[in-house]
UniProtKB/Swiss-Prot annotation:
Residues 218-290 are annotated as: Disordered. Residues 119-213 bind DNA. Disulfide bonds: none annotated. It comes from Xenopus laevis. GO terms for biological process: anatomical structure morphogenesis; cell differentiation; negative regulation of DNA-templated transcription; nervous system development; regulation of DNA-templated transcription; regulation of transcription by RNA polymerase II. Keywords: Developmental protein, Differentiation, DNA-binding, Neurogenesis, Nucleus, Repressor, Transcription, Transcription regulation. Its main location: nucleus. Induction: By activin. Down-regulated indirectly by bmp-4 signaling, mediated via vent1. This is Forkhead box protein A4-B.
Length: 400
């Protein structure tokens, strides 16, 4: 910087005389003494000094001395950089990293398998099926199946004990494989395994990647149905289902003459009791429930004409409790001919309204009515009179 200023101003004055010695920067050869030994120094210092030679012409003495000092500095830095440079035989990577990379490539445990040694995308049932279907006799022993799998798929050459157990379980627990005993003509060890004749549609179009459906033998299905049918809970359910059918048969076999004879009775409750008691179903709780429930249902075993005839004769015996309650009852939606057979729909005993939804209690109530008859009505009227007589022992006007 000072040299350029001196050249531009063309001042022949010596700058060293204007400054003290401690105010002027020292030379470069004195600066290297304060640098650490392991500091980085550029290797192209000599090129810089050579490029600065054009300034040496016409320069005063101090500048030439500085240039000479730079030349000695370049030789010294070359020796320092040469001592720090790595040997030419080694690469740019650290020594330990190169050794680890070579060991990684030589390790057989980390060797990546190719596609031929990969696990095949087939289940054990698919492997067994393929082996049997490719056999000339369409049957193979267990050892032959093992050998066929090992020869075709190198993956199964390791850990043979594991997948061989899976093969045996697949043969035993699947209905699509049948065990065929050896014939006397072919002596040897182990029985043959073949496919079930009806298991040909397990796989879709010969693709063994996935089964279309699980094959189940029909014989095993029938055996399971018989075992389920022998359970004790099914016996009671079957008897309950048969009870309404037997009652319908009894009601259909009942003659109109018997209905007329029953209609001659005085009490309505006694006639109902006679109709239910005269049936061959019996007095068991199950039969009573079925009888009371069937009074509210349309008998499926009869035709419309026969049913209307029975209703016309027994209209005073069987009243529909839902007839006058809502417009969507079955009697409201039937034909007008059937509506004509109900002239006294609204004439129903109001005491049975709270017993409509309880069939057991309604049957007990009818039995109670049939036993007492009209005595219940007379007794109730007498008790009511006595009750009010006790309350009003004297006239009301006299109390005023």
């Amino acid at each position: 910087m000072l040299n350029r200023v001196k050249l531009e101003l063309k001042d022949p004055m010596d700058w060293n005389t204007m400054y003290q010695e401690n105010e002027i920067y020292s030379g470069i050869h004195n600066m290297t003494n304060g640098l650490p030994s392991n500091s980085f120094l550029p290797t192209d210092v000599p090129t810089v000094t050579s490029s600065m030679t054009y300034m040496s012409n016409g320069l005063p003495g101090p500048v030439a001395s500085i240039q000479g000092n730079l030349g000695s500095l370049g030789s010294m830095t070359q020796g320092m950089v040469g001592s720090l440079a790595p040997p030419p035989s080694t690469s740019a990577y650290p020594l330990g990293y190169c050794q680890g990379e070579s060991e990684f490539q030589r390790d057989p445990r980390t060797y990546r398998r190719n596609y031929s040694h990969a696990k095949p995308p087939y289940s054990y049932i698919s492997l067994i099926t393929m082996a049997i279907q490719q056999a000339p006799n369409k049957m193979m022993t267990l050892n032959e199946i093992y050998q066929w799998i090992v020869d075709l798929f190198p993956y199964y050459r390791q850990n043979q004990q594991r997948w061989q157990n899976s093969i045996r379980h697949s043969l035993s627990f699947n209905d699509c494989f049948i065990k065929v005993p050896r014939s006397p003509e072919k002596p040897g060890k182990g029985s043959y395994w073949t496919l079930h004749p009806e298991s040909g549609n397990m796989f879709e179009n010969g693709c063994y990647l996935r089964r279309q459906k699980r094959f189940k033998c029909e014989r095993s299905k029938s055996g399971e149905g018989e075992r389920k049918g022998n359970k004790p809970g099914d016996e009671t359910g079957g008897s309950l289902k048969e009870t309404p059918v037997s009652f319908d048969d009894c009601s259909s076999s009942r003659s109109p003459q018997a209905a007329v004879n029953d209609g001659g009775r005085d009490s309505t409750g006694s006639s109902i009791h006679q109709a239910t008691g005269g049936s061959p179903v019996g007095f068991s709780p199950t039969s009573e429930q079925a009888g009371t429930a069937s009074q509210l249902m349309y008998p499926l075993g009869l035709s419309n004409d026969g049913y209307l005839g029975l209703v016309g004769e027994d209209v005073h015996l069987k009243h529909d409790p839902f007839s006058g309650r809502h417009p969507f009852s079955i009697t409201q939606l039937m034909s007008s001919e059937q509506d004509q057979t109900y002239p006294n729909k609204m004439e129903m005993c109001p005491t049975t309204d709270h017993l409509v939804h309880y069939s057991n209690y309604s049957s007990d109530y009818h039995n109670l009515v049939s036993k007492n008859g009209l005595d219940m009505q007379t007794s109730s009227s007498s008790t009511d009179n006595g009750y009010y007589a006790n309350m009003y022992s004297r006239p009301i006007l006299s109390s005023l």
